[in-house]
A protein has these predicted regions:
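Primarily recognizes the serine-hydrolase "nucleophile elbow" in alpha/beta-hydrolase
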Residues: 124-153
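Catalytic-loop region of hydrolases
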Residues: 2-16
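Serine-hydrolase catalytic machinery in alpha/beta-hydrolase-like enzymes
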Residues: 23-131
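Generic detector of intrinsically disordered, low-complexity, polar/charged segments
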Residues: 4, 8, 59, 137, ...
Length: 153
């Protein structure tokens, strides 16, 4: 039985450069709990001076990027669980390969390789974040769920 691939691919960039990979971390969406108030929202760069440390959820977004639903969920997690939430932003790469499903498995694997690199970098870099207390879990949704599930420390 032949599979009909009715999805489509957009974008030309199929591999990270050191600069595009770094941008996924530096521009990550970060939410920190805030006792008595709304969670604090910013980027890794904006929280360089933060002094209070928290356990963290490193959350891998789906193929739609850091969309409004991801932001709401991250803020809820930070507030409800009193954890830092960091969402590396893979959409920082201009003209990055994206898709609408279904496409051949080889095309998904190109994207999964990029996403795996982003998560690996995040797990290295988070150790240097002043708001990180050394405890982390990894989670994700959809395309990001595959990234989280495949992660090997």
């Amino acid at each position: 039985m032949a599979i009909e691939y009715t999805g489509s691919l957009q974008g030309k960039v199929r591999a990270h450069t050191p600069e595009t990979l770094a941008a996924t971390w530096l521009n990550a969406y970060v939410v920190l709990p805030n006792a008595g108030g709304a969670p604090k929202v910013g980027t890794v760069e904006e929280f360089k001076g933060e002094t209070k440390a928290y356990p963290a959820v490193v959350f891998c977004h789906g193929s739609s990027g850091v969309n409004p639903q991801i932001k709401i969920f991250a803020q809820w997690l930070a507030d409800a669980l009193r954890v830092a939430v960091v969402v590396p932003d893979s959409m920082q790469t201009e003209d990055r390969l994206t898709y609408s499903s279904p496409v051949p498995a080889a095309d998904y694997e190109i994207i999964h390789k990029m996403r795996s690199q982003e998560l690996a970098l995040a797990m290295i870099e988070i150790k240097h974040a002043p708001w990180f207390d050394g405890r982390a879990i990894i989670a994700g949704t959809s395309e990001g769920g595959v990234t989280a599930a495949r992660y090997q420390a």
